[in-house]
A protein has these predicted regions:
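Beta-rich carbohydrate-recognition and catalytic domains
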Residues: 26-265, 270-287
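Bacterial Sec-dependent N-terminal signal peptides
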Residues: 1-27
Length: 287
């Protein structure tokens, strides 16, 4: 009887596990409305893996959460061949809705989409630098906002997480204790509806002069409009040692004046004698 009881309990547990798995199984539905492809994922995984074909034109991809901060990303989705995948975060919730503009209904990408909670970043490129810093995947350029705090060197950099060409400018992020060995972190500041997050600098506000908190890390960066490429200076602040940033609600803090163009790349530093912050911004002016 004891043996039969154990078998019965085991069978019940297996059925419960099966029911739980079934209840939370992922389901992806794709539909087309005009020039928009709508992908709905029930019980979404962490990522939707997007197949990339570098030679093709960019489509626009959006995670639609209904927020004013939802941002279209430019992605070279696979048309008739695939070079590699990039992860597209689906966020949390029972359903994730992804919208795509500029993708043909018969594009190969729609047959190659994958759902996954992980993304393999194993370095398989023989010629990839092992000493010089490179991101786990994607495109990088200028180092930005380099700062030292609490035993860590912070390296932020121009970063496109959706391909190996320029675009979708974010601030990527890595930290190191010795400037040689780097820990890769999630992008710190993402492209937003205003535009791309261009280069800038960071400071540790030891005296809380800005009011964001003592020892907050404050990033000062150029926001480049996705529409007309106007450039303005914005700030964001972090109270968790640079892992995440909150964009200042009063952005922009500085706009072009006196006919200035190419108004970007702010460098900020504290002038102790004057007890104030100074900002140096590169600019061009036609005369």
């Amino acid at each position: 009887m004891k043996s039969n009881s154990m078998i019965t309990k085991a069978a019940c547990l297996m059925l419960m596990a099966s029911a739980t798995t079934s209840a939370f199984a992922q389901k992806m539905n794709i539909e087309h409305k005009g020039d928009t492809t709508i992908i709905k994922v029930e019980n979404p995984t962490k990522y939707l893996l997007l197949p990339i074909q570098e030679e093709k034109d960019e489509a626009q991809v959006l995670l639609d959460t209904g927020s004013k901060d939802d941002t279209w990303m430019d992605v070279r989705l696979a048309q008739n061949g695939s070079d590699y995948y990039v992860p597209f975060a689906l966020g949390k919730g029972k359903t994730a809705t992804v919208k795509i503009l500029g993708l043909k209904k018969d594009a190969l990408a729609l047959n190659l989409l994958k759902l996954s909670d992980t993304f393999d970043t194993t370095n398989t490129d023989y010629y990839r630098p092992s000493y010089h810093f490179t991101p786990l995947y994607g495109w990088m350029n200028d180092p930005n906002g380099m700062v030292y705090k609490d035993g860590e060197y912070h390296l932020y950099f121009q970063y496109n997480p959706y391909g190996s060409k320029w675009g979708n400018m974010h601030w990527g992020h890595a930290v190191s204790k010795d400037l040689v060995h780097w820990e890769h972190l999630e992008p710190a500041i993402a492209r937003d509806p205003v535009g791309h997050i261009f280069s800038g600098s960071s400071v540790v506000d030891k005296k809380n002069t800005a009011g964001f908190g003592k020892n907050a890390i404050i990033a000062i960066y150029t926001n480049n409009s996705s529409v007309n490429h106007d450039e303005v200076q914005c700030i964001a602040y972090s109270n968790d040692n640079g892992r995440t940033f909150t964009k200042y609600e009063g952005n922009p803090v500085l706009t072009p004046f006196d006919g200035l163009k190419d108004f970007r790349d702010p460098k900020v530093f504290w002038y102790e004698k004057g007890k104030c912050w100074y900002m140096i911004v590169s600019a061009d002016k036609e005369t």
